[in-house]
Amino acid sequence: MAPKKKVTGLIKLQIKAGAANPAPPIGPALGQHGVNIMEFCKAYNAQTESQRGNVIPVEITVYEDRTFTFILKTPPAAELIKKAAGVAKGSGTPHTVKVAKLTMDQVREIAEQKQADLNANDIDAAAKIIAGTARSMGITVEA
């Protein structure tokens, strides 16, 4: 087994799928760690091509020799909720002004998609987390 490389940095970014380019905010974030920005952009765009339109969080691990690896996460819950509810953004005053409604089936569907990244043991717990996020955005969840 090859010797372990020393990690020098961990960068977390949220980038639109298939739309990574060296312009800010990506360029400066990677540049200060000495990563080849174009190489990352090409690799990220190739891996997220099928998910165009979504925002995909990525965790980039930078090593001492300036190489990097990255892990793609699932889209943020808020983005998935907005897409399912068909709204552009959540409510400015979530507890007084409701902007949309979601059914429990839609919430469960989002929970299944997010299950890997959520701190939940089963789908019911994951659905509760998603429902809470929806409520905080001014979207009512119907049972």
UniProtKB/Swiss-Prot annotation:
GO biological process: one example: translation
Keyword Kinase: no
Post-translational modification: One or more lysine residues are methylated.
Family matches, as SMART domains: RL11
Gene Ontology CC: one annotated term: cytosolic large ribosomal subunit
Presence of keyword Transport: no
Gene Ontology molecular function: any one: large ribosomal subunit rRNA binding
Matches recorded under CDD domains: Ribosomal_L11
InterPro entries in the record: Ribosomal_uL11 (IPR000911), Ribosomal_uL11_bac-typ (IPR006519), Ribosomal_uL11_C (IPR020783), Ribosomal_uL11_C_sf (IPR036769), Ribosomal_uL11_CS (IPR020785), Ribosomal_uL11_N (IPR020784), Ribosomal_uL11_N_sf (IPR036796)
Keyword entries, A-Z: Methylation, Ribonucleoprotein, Ribosomal protein, RNA-binding, rRNA-binding
A Pfam family annotated for this UniProt entry: Ribosomal_L11
Subunit architecture: Part of the ribosomal stalk of the 50S ribosomal subunit. Interacts with L10 and the large rRNA to form the base of the stalk. L10 forms an elongated spine to which L12 dimers bind in a sequential fashion forming a multimeric L10(L12)X complex.
Family label: Belongs to the universal ribosomal protein uL11 family.
Known function: Forms part of the ribosomal stalk which helps the ribosome interact with GTP-bound translation factors.
Protein name in the entry: Large ribosomal subunit protein uL11
Organism the protein comes from: Clavibacter sepedonicus
Gene: rplK
